[in-house]
Amino acid sequence: MSGFVEKPEPVQVPGLTHLHTGKVRDLYRNEAGDLVMVASDRISAYDWVLPTEIPDKGRVLTRLSLWWFDQLADLVPNHVISTELPPGAPADWAGRTLICKSLRMVEVECVARGYLTGSGLVEYDATRTVCGIGLPEGLVNGSELPGPIFTPATKAAVGDHDENVSYEDIAREVGPETAAELRRTTLDVYRRARDIAHGRGIILADTKFEFGFETAEDGTERLIIADEVLTPDSSRFWPAATWEPGRAQPSYDKQFVRDWLTSPASGWDRASEQPPPALPPEIVAATRAKYIEAYEVLTGTNWA
């Protein structure tokens, strides 16, 4: 089993229609037809959305995405219209809410990898390829790749795994021109972010983006980057000072949560069909601190 341990009820706000409850974000539509995206403090691990929230996590993700959108503005436009709180919205939505353009979304997770780890490592160990891209012998967990690669995946529902697919599969799905634009833009954004992060002592190992098309009045379309960008939820950030290929790398993400859930202390058997337990306060505090540290190191600004 997988999914929500306790699925939250959507907040009812006058003038907003609830569309979707995701792992982290709740999506609404306002009366103007724009999307209202609210980043919650929910956290997921091992395909479960956990019953315990991480305070301020949604605000960290939102503020960090906005910072990255500014760094990327000359490469690709983004979907943000406003950060104003909708009338009648709860006060807790402040700092975690974006009013966004309604786009024709491309149903592809656009993943860029500069280092070998995660599902890419599993595939490489079996085939010496990742998403059909041949890689040299001798790579290990954490190895830097000869150059960044585009490794798309199909988007999965809550509780399911995204599935890695080849570029050729994506080209058949969305058309060769769109596939080429997705690959080019994904790798351009990755390279920009990689270089910015490197200057702050951070390795951007891999990351995933979502894109959609905005239609102009004359019927032409342009590619827009959407959802979140370059956050600890969508990316693997490693401290460069401790990078050592051949082992799992320390990271700025929810590793505290994963480690505790798979430890004897949790009492949870991942192989069972039972949902995971609530997180203890010390794991919540350590995870919150790690998200805030990622924000502060990447942006060079204090969270408070």
Swiss-Prot record:
Its EC number is 6.3.2.6. It catalyses: 5-amino-1-(5-phospho-D-ribosyl)imidazole-4-carboxylate + L-aspartate + ATP = (2S)-2-[5-amino-1-(5-phospho-beta-D-ribosyl)imidazole-4-carboxamido]succinate + ADP + phosphate + 2 H(+). GO terms for cellular component: cytoplasm. Pathway: Purine metabolism; IMP biosynthesis via de novo pathway; 5-amino-1-(5-phospho-D-ribosyl)imidazole-4-carboxamide from 5-amino-1-(5-phospho-D-ribosyl)imidazole-4-carboxylate: step 1/2. Signal peptide: none annotated. It is an enzyme of class 6 (ligase). It comes from the Bacteria. It holds the Pfam family SAICAR_synt. One of its GO terms (molecular function) is ATP binding. GO terms for biological process: 'de novo' IMP biosynthetic process. The keyword Nucleotide-binding applies. Keywords: ATP-binding, Ligase, Nucleotide-binding, Purine biosynthesis. Belongs to the SAICAR synthetase family. NCBIfam families: PRK13961.1, purC. This is Phosphoribosylaminoimidazole-succinocarboxamide synthase. It comes from Streptomyces griseus subsp. griseus (strain JCM 4626 / CBS 651.72 / NBRC 13350 / KCC S-0626 / ISP 5235).
